[in-house]
Amino acid sequence: MESKPSRIPRRISVQPSGSLSTRMVSGNRGTSLNDSYHSRDSSFRLDSEYQSASASACASPCQPAWYSESEIPQGARARAQTQQRDHDSKRPKLSCTNCASTSAGRNGGSGLNTVSDSSWRHSQVPRSSSMVLGSFGTDLMRERRDLDRRRESSISNLMDYNHRSGDFTTSSYVQERVPSSYSQGARPKENAVSTLQLNSSSTNHQLPSDHQTVPSSRDSSRSSFRSHFSPRQSESFRNSSHPAFSYFSSRNETPTISNSERGSSQRPYRESSDNEGRRTTRRLLSRIASSMSSTFFSRRSSQDSLNTRSLSSENYISPRTLTSQSRNNGTSSSSDVSEGRAAEASQGFRFLRRRWGLSSLSQNHSSEPEAENFNQESEGRNSGPWLSSSLRNRCTPLFSRRRREGRDESSRMSTSDVPPRSHIFRRDSNEVVHLEAQGDSLGAAANRPQASGASSSAAAGGSTPELPQGGRNPGLTGILPGSLFRFAVPPALGSNLADNVMITVDIIPSGWNSTDGKNDKAKSAPSRDPEKLQKIKESLLLEDSDDEEEGDLCRICQMAAASSSNLLIEPCKCTGSLQYVHQECMKKWLQAKINSGSSLEAVTTCELCKEKLQLNLEDFDIHELHRAHANEQAEYEFISSGLYLVVLLHLCEQSFSDMMGNTIEPSTRVRFINLARTLQAHMEDLETSEDEF
């Protein structure tokens, strides 16, 4: 990952390849130091691979000035010789690093030196600066470890324990941030005075550096360089016996050679952080997979799945646990990491192959163990602490529940002592197939969907049918004896049925049998006998002739004159069958029109010919009837309005009294009674005035 351009210093591990221009150390100091190191069993062998490297071909050559043999104190040399023989296998590994782009510091004059990422500064080192050679034995390591522990509290803001590179797992990967602990191999820097320099009075390992220069190379394009390691190169670089050196720049540009990292102490921390990150990643993947599988796919809920759940909770060992254990036992390269991630992805998204396993179970018997393994893994993954099994059982889909109930019922019926009976099924080609109901029909996995559907749809049936000879199913329709249901199975694509087969169930009458079913078309077809059609036509003609013989009919009741008191009259100019009407029928019609609230003109006008009615009816005055009805309507309206006014007045009085605060219930009741009496007296006066007129 790319580091942020902020306060976190970066350390760039440099391994010069063949393409980079390397330069042998020249001068008496370098040769004498090389000779002294080669004489000590090649403890600090300065080969051309691990000496200074330039960033580009056009850059200035990197010529580091090493110490001369005379400048190294005799005590340090003797101590190093004795310690080196004892601790030859524990030689530290140092890498050339460059602290880049850091601008942190609590005080104004303190902090890390800001060094350009593209080039190194080429400057003279002050006389007060010193270069400490930090690989003279375990006593010097112990003293520096004590110094690190003292200064952990003051530089805790620059620490990042959890950072690790995602590309390299060996000790020489490119680290973007500066770790703080000694096991990580870096040295924290506080202020202008380097905190990693040892005092001359306590260690006597400081070396004069009057004429030393910091090697640097400045490119015209200011392009930074970084060394990219492959996993094998990094592994060989870690196991190599050649030590590297790390340069740390502080505010006063004091170069210090220190022990950069120790692989044996660094490995447990890095592996623990890697395992923790992988464990959280696997946990997230398993949660996503289980949630998506429980949401989008219906589980196969049966007795087998219940047993599988109990077995998987006891005996199932997750491959992820085995993978994490194997990675804890030894170091892993980047190829192992990529293989582990591929395995994690296949485990996390195995729910995508879950439905494939279930469908292959219904198509082929040989794939049943693989489908059971998928079911075990999904059940073991779903039994996490974040979603309990009881809650998932309550959220079982409806169709899965129905399928489970059908299987339970079919298993109970198959175990019961029921004699085998023959059922009659009809294929779509109208050929009758006789099937024997076997008690062990549930043993075949291909017949599970049909058995469950038939037993759930026909609850009163005896047993479940079985497919004939395991061939193609063109579609079956049949009836279970002793039941009122008829089911039909659609044709399947293969020799067996899938889980999502839809079975059609019809309710049939009690007196239905197979022969009636065959004669359905004959009975449903209408009879086209010409003799019956002729008889119908003759009866219709006779009715028409009878109507003609009856003569005139009333246009309201469609009957002839029955008595002399109810004769047929011609009220208007209508002709034909609408010409005549009974007197009583006409009176009823006119009365209905008056009661409906029609006007006098509308009552005395014919609705068909729009002519005025010419009526001479006994005891029937249209004008008088219309006026009486109008008076009644006015009285009704007056009473309705009066009652409305009384109620409105009462409400207004009550609200007024409430507002004035003088609400007295007896007085209000008396006033209401007086108002009602006044209204009744007014109504009596109106009635007397109408009688006078």
Curated annotation (Swiss-Prot):
The modification N-acetylmethionine is found at M1. Its EC number is 2.3.2.27. GO terms for biological process: negative regulation of cilium assembly; negative regulation of DNA damage response, signal transduction by p53 class mediator; negative regulation of intrinsic apoptotic signaling pathway in response to DNA damage by p53 class mediator; negative regulation of proteasomal protein catabolic process; negative regulation of protein autoubiquitination; negative regulation of T cell proliferation; positive regulation of cell population proliferation; positive regulation of protein polyubiquitination. The modification Phosphoserine is found at S318, S390, S689. It comes from the Eukaryota. Its main location: cytoplasm. InterPro entries: RING-CH-type_E3_ubiq-ligase, Znf_RING-CH, Znf_RING/FYVE/PHD. The keyword Glycoprotein does not apply. Gene3D superfamilies: Zinc/RING finger domain, C3HC4 (zinc finger) (3.30.40.10). SUPFAM superfamilies: RING/U-box. Disruption phenotype: Mice have defects in formation of corpus callosum and show degeneration of substantia gelatinosa lamina II axons in adulthood. They have normal lymphoid development but show hyperproliferation of T-cells in response to mitogens. Residues 268-279, 517-533 have a biased composition (Basic and acidic residues). Zn(2+) 2 binds at C572, C574, C606, C609. The modification Phosphothreonine is found at T688. Residues 14-36, 95-105, 112-132, 167-184, 192-215, 236-267, 306-323 have a biased composition (Polar residues). SMART domains: RINGv. Pathway: Protein modification; protein ubiquitination. CDD domains: RING_CH-C4HC3_MARCH7. One of its GO terms (molecular function) is zinc ion binding. The keyword Cytoplasm applies. Residues 216-234, 296-305, 324-337, 451-463 have a biased composition (Low complexity). A zinc finger (RING-CH-type) spans 546-616. It is found in: Cytoplasm. E3 ubiquitin-protein ligase which may specifically enhance the E2 activity of HIP2. E3 ubiquitin ligases accept ubiquitin from an E2 ubiquitin-conjugating enzyme in the form of a thioester and then directly transfer the ubiquitin to targeted substrates. May be involved in T-cell proliferation by regulating LIF secretion. May play a role in lysosome homeostasis. Promotes 'Lys-6', 'Lys-11' and 'Lys-63'-linked mixed polyubiquitination on ATG14 leading to the inhibition of autophagy by impairing the interaction between ATG14 and STX7. The RING-CH-type zinc finger domain is required for E3 ligase activity. This is E3 ubiquitin-protein ligase MARCHF7. The gene is Marchf7.
